[in-house]
Amino acid sequence: TAGFGVFTNIINGGLECGK
């Protein structure tokens, strides 16, 4: 997701945000 992607980017190393 876009909103959660920012935080997920830091946690998962950019899996969601890098999608």
UniProtKB/Swiss-Prot annotation:
GO terms for MF: endochitinase activity
Function comment: Defense against chitin-containing fungal pathogens.
Keywords linked to the UniProt accession: Carbohydrate metabolism, Cell wall, Chitin degradation, Disulfide bond, Glycosidase, Hydrolase, Plant defense, Polysaccharide degradation, Secreted
Protein name: Endochitinase 2
Catalytically driven reaction(s): Random endo-hydrolysis of N-acetyl-beta-D-glucosaminide (1->4)-beta-linkages in chitin and chitodextrins
Stated family: Belongs to the glycosyl hydrolase 19 family. Chitinase class I subfamily.
One of the GO biological process terms: defense response
Major location category of this protein: secreted
Compartment annotation: Secreted, Cell wall
Organism field: Taxus baccata (English yew)
GO cellular component: a single term: extracellular region
EC nos: 3.2.1.14
